[in-house]
Swiss-Prot record:
Protein name: Arginine--tRNA ligase
Organism: Wolbachia pipientis wMel
Main location: cytoplasm
InterPro entries assigned to the protein according to its UniProt record, in alphabetical order: aa-tRNA-synth_I_CS, Arg-tRNA-ligase, Arg-tRNA-synth_N, Arg-tRNA-synth_N_sf, ArgRS_core, DALR_anticod-bd, Rossmann-like_a/b/a_fold, tRNAsynth_Ia_anticodon-bd
Keyword Ion transport: no
């Protein structure tokens, strides 16, 4: 039960009724309904009177007074108050909250599972790092974000495909092959010198050694050999998959840019755009910030992306006649649409912000506005040790890898901490803090709440009467129940906005409400969860504890994190 949607539905029905009775002239109100930030203002507030006032051209207080009388008739509502310039605050009956508590324990971890996706197919593309080396920590943030978002979308009823686009065409791959070829020669005993611009990483040595073992000297003088290319990319992709596996990330599909180009998908997709009159030969203006002496205007093949809200039209071919990277992007998204995906999400680093409008333009053009794409950007991660900036340099070379971080703090900690900030905000990751067993460590704080709940259930008397939730009436108990009741609403909002960090924030809120309630028992023995002389109240409180454990476990399952029943 999403109590906020339930009350919203009642309000909509009431507005339609009032319109039919001639009390108001419109019922179409895009109003807010959510829990107030201050508990004294009730359980739910809405600005519906203020929204209606604009349509009715009346004082919002006057409309609020009419609506308040009507809302008081709802079975779920105990009291209605008008606040400020027309806000309506509703206090729900205590029985509503007890009923939701029962529902949580009936549904267990399925509480919060929704069907807003209606089993629609959705493609979530994330990581898609160039296959030139191990995943660095920026990729790790994107990997966790994409994976958890995919899990979240599954929870709300979408049929999700997790995809990785292999950027295995272009200059960076040529550079990689030349770098591996040197390592191959080195493995055969030749002395090498790694020239500027090549990849110097030690991770390439085993690939060169593998080539030498498998082919001996057969590939010498064959730097551009397809065998070297295929072996290298296969080896690098295996490294990337191992890194992602350490993070708990697995993709369903890997799509190769190189294979797309070979299949003729670029030519096919460009022809479709051309047939729609969206490709032309023209000239681009000098980009802002570009020095005139470094800019030469030339006639180019262009895509009319400005027709779809982009800032400029986009070049499809380079000066040498080869396709641009953007042309490959067109082919790739044409391929997605051809596979039946009308809903797409792409995760990119914040340095790719300029791609957002052009990708939306392409998808809109190729699908005649039938397909939708959402581009989510992730920002950088700063690392600290006890508040001091640190740089880690291990076997991976001169950059911090995903493997380095997971091996330092563990998979679950890495996944959770990566979502303690909104994806487009800079994230600070303190190695010392995330290993602390304190409330300053977010994942510990949440896991400790779950473990504490299971400890209480293990230590409770074995023979308890049937739980009666109506015995739960203290402020702390009701606040925890109300916090748990928000879970379906949190899940839906997080999924609709593609913001899985909202789950993190909510779990911390739940953990805090529980820890505070547990703390009351230190100063007031009657507030303890287990009361040997009051088994009925103990049973009711264990019922609440059980519901809390279900909700936390449900939330952690979206992160693919195992909830702990005992802290080590």
């Amino acid at each position: 039960m999403n109590i906020f949607k339930q009350i919203s539905s009642l309000i909509f029905s009431k507005l339609n009724e009032l319109k039919q009775r001639g009390v108001i002239s419109t019922s179409a109100a895009n109003f807010i309904i959510e829990p107030p930030s201050n508990r004294v203002h009730g359980d739910i507030y809405t600005n519906v009177a203020m929204v209606l006032a604009k349509h009715e051209k009346k004082n919002p207080i006057e409309i609020a007074e009419v609506l308040a009388k009507e809302f008081e008739l709802f079975d779920e509502v105990a009291k209605v108050e008008i606040a400020g310039s027309g806000f309506i605050n509703m206090h729900l009956k205590i029985e509503v909250w007890h009923g939701i508590l029962k529902q949580i324990n009936e549904l267990k971890t399925e509480f919060g599972t929704l069907d807003i996706g209606n089993n629609q197919a959705i493609n979530v593309e994330f990581v898609s790092a160039n296959p030139t080396g191990p995943l660095h920590i920026g990729h790790a943030r994107g990997a966790v974000f994409g994976d958890v978002l995919a899990n979240l979308l599954k929870k709300v009823g979408y049929k999700v495909t997790k995809e990785y686009y292999i950027n295995d065409a272009g200059a960076q791959i040529d550079t990689l092959i030349r770098s591996v070829y040197l390592r191959y020669k080195e493995a055969l005993g030749e002395k090498i010198s790694i020239e500027k611009g090549l990849y110097p990483g030690e991770y390439l040595k085993p690939i060169g050694t593998g080539l030498a073992k498998k082919y001996g000297a057969e590939l010498l003088e064959k730097q551009d050999n397809q065998v070297i290319r295929d072996y290298t990319l296969s080896s690098i992709l295996e490294i990337i998959k191992e890194d992602m596996n350490l993070l708990g990330v697995n993709h369903d599909v890997f799509t190769s840019e190189y294979e797309l180009q070979k299949s003729g998908k670029i030519e096919e997709s460009i022809k479709i755009l051309s047939d729609k009159g969206l490709v032309y030969e023209g000239y681009l203006e000098k980009p802002k910030g570009k020095e005139s002496e470094n800019w030469t205007s030339r006639k180019e093949m262009l895509f009319r992306s400005t027709k779809f809200g982009d800032d400029v039209d986009r070049a499809l071919k380079k000066e040498d006649g080869s396709w641009t990277y953007f042309a490959s992007d067109i082919a790739y998204h044409f391929d997605k649409i051809s596979r039946g995906f009308n809903n797409m999400i792409v995760e990119l680093g914040s340095d790719h912000g300029g791609y957002v409008k052009r990708l939306k333009a392409v998808v809109s053009a190729l699908s005649d506005d039938q397909a939708k794409i959402e581009v989510k950007l992730h920002n950088i991660v700063n690392f600290f040790e006890n508040g001091k900036p640190v740089k880690m340099s291990k076997r991976s070379g001169n950059f911090l890898t995903a493997r380095d971080v997971v091996e330092e703090v563990g998979r679950d900690i890495t996944r959770f901490i990566m979502l303690t900030r909104k994806n487009d905000m800079v994230l600070d990751f303190d190695f010392a803090k995330v290993k602390e067993q304190s409330k300053d460590n977010p994942i510990f704080y949440v896991q400790y709440a779950h473990a504490r709940a299971h400890s209480l259930m293990r230590n409770a008397p074995k023979e308890l009467p049937t739980a009666d939730p109506s015995l739960l009436r203290t402020g702390g108990e009701l606040f925890l129940i109300k916090t748990l009741a928000k879970w379906p609403d949190v899940v839906e909002i997080a999924a609709r906005l593609c913001e899985p960090h909202r789950i993190t924030f909510y779990l911390l809120e739940v953990a805090e409400a529980f820890h505070v309630l547990w703390g009351y028992g230190k100063s007031d023995l009657n507030m303890r969860f287990i009361l040997e002389d009051n088994l009925n109240l103990t049973a009711a409180r264990m019922f609440l504890v059980q519901a809390l454990a279900h909700v936390i476990a449900s939330g952690l399952s979206i992160f693919n994190i195992e909830p702990l029943e005992e802290m080590s």
